[in-house]
Design a protein with these regions (language model features):
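Glycine-rich flavin
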Residues: 3-9, 14-155
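Rossmann-like NAD(P)H-binding beta-loop-alpha module
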Residues: 153-186
Length: 186
């Protein structure tokens, strides 16, 4: 949308969920915030390394909820900044779920009903959802996806992470830094 506006085109975004998609809300941004905070915990707990610099620290404590709140605050700020930028540039945001309705048409389902829009060009940017292998059911507590993990609602003593892509590896780093034992399954 930003590129289209800068190229002189009129643009609109059909957005069913939070502005910013997967990266801003459940991926890149909150995971990097969790990595930064948990990385500080790991560094401060490495007493031997710190002593080599002449630094001595006592027990390192952290508030799990404050770390999660920090990530959430960063997400909210970026969502707001993105929304404000789009509004300032004249990009319309249509809240709802869009489906293609033929050539150059999108039908958007909202709480108020459906409306069809016509556009010269339509770009599909559906985002992503975590992959859950067939036969596995998530309950959000004992079996959960990265979408739940990003909230850092609890710290299990042991956690198995299925998938060693960048999200799995980042969560492995976060959870081990905060004291959890992690097993990676690929």
């Amino acid at each position: 949308a930003l590129h289209a506006v800068k190229s002189g085109l009129k643009a609109a975004i059909v957005q069913a969920a939070d502005m910013g998609g997967s990266c801003v809300n459940r991926g890149c941004i909150p995971s990097k915030a969790l990595l930064a905070a948990s990385g500080r915990v790991r560094e401060l707990r490495d007493k031997h390394h710190l002593q080599s610099f002449g630094i001595q620290v006592g027990d390192v404590q952290f508030e799990r909820s404050a770390i999660a709140d920090h990530a959430g605050s960063l997400v909210s700020k970026i969502q707001g900044d993105l929304t404000n930028s789009l509004t300032r540039l004249g990009v319309d945001t249509i809240r709802g779920w869009g489906t293609l309705a033929g050539g150059q048409k999108v039908t958007v389902a909202t709480a108020d009903g459906e409306k069809t829009y016509t556009a010269k060009d339509i770009m599909l940017s559906p985002g992503s959802i975590p992959f859950v292998p067939p036969g596995i059911e998530t309950d959000g507590k004992t079996v959960f996806t990265s979408d739940e993990a990003i909230r850092l609602d609890w710290l299990p003593q042991w956690i198995a992470i299925i998938g060693s892509g960048y999200i799995g590896l980042e969560f492995s780093d976060v959870y081990t830094a905060l004291g959890c034992e992690v097993s990676m399954i690929e």
